[in-house]
């Protein structure tokens, strides 16, 4: 009596996954070995914070915010000011110890020429720390 194996010589229904597993393991090993080599680490020696720097930060004067509108109007800490009064206030602020930083806030449509003039006035009066204030874009 002969038993049939049930295979009538038709197509094989099972997929042989052994070669796939072998290839995947080789790729995994390659990635594990090369991943540390791909990260370029730049060695930077960062400064260490100490108590003296903290005390210096507490002694700083409050910053001055100077807003410039499109039409050239100026606002000293949200109060309107003329260019003539601006020069006298800047020279007074420049003589303070410690000198307060000047933050320029320009309207989006303000011409760069106007901002440049105000920066020159501030530097001419002796302001050392002049910065610009910008808002972060909504997409970032």
UniProtKB/Swiss-Prot annotation:
Subcellular location: Cell inner membrane
One GO MF term: transmembrane transporter activity
Gene Ontology cellular component terms for the protein in this record: plasma membrane
Stretches assigned to the Periplasmic side: 38-140
Superkingdom of the organism of origin: Bacteria
Keywords: Cell inner membrane, Cell membrane, Membrane, Protein transport, Transmembrane, Transmembrane helix, Transport
Cytoplasmic side: 1-16
Family: Belongs to the ExbD/TolR family.
Subunit structure: The accessory proteins ExbB and ExbD seem to form a complex with TonB.
UniProt cross-references to PANTHER family, sorted A to Z: BIOPOLYMER TRANSPORT PROTEIN EXBD (PTHR30558:SF12), EXBD MEMBRANE COMPONENT OF PMF-DRIVEN MACROMOLECULE IMPORT SYSTEM (PTHR30558)
Protein name: Biopolymer transport protein exbD1
Gene assigned in the entry: exbD1
């Amino acid at each position: 009596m002969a038993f049939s194996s049930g295979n009538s010589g038709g197509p094989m229904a099972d997929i042989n996954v052994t070669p796939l597993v072998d290839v995947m393991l080789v790729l995994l090993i390659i990635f594990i070995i090369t991943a540390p080599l791909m990260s370029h680490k730049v060695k930077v020696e960062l400064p260490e914070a100490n108590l003296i720097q903290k005390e210096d930060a507490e002694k700083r004067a409050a910053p001055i915010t100077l807003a410039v509108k499109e039409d050239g109007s100026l606002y000293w800490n949200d109060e309107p000011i003329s260019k003539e009064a601006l020069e006298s206030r800047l020279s007074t602020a420049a003589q303070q110890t410690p000198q307060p930083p000047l933050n320029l806030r320009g309207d989006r449509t303000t011409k760069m020429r106007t901002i440049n003039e105000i920066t020159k006035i501030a530097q001419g009066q002796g302001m050392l720390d002049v910065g610009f204030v910008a808002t972060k874009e909504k997409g970032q």
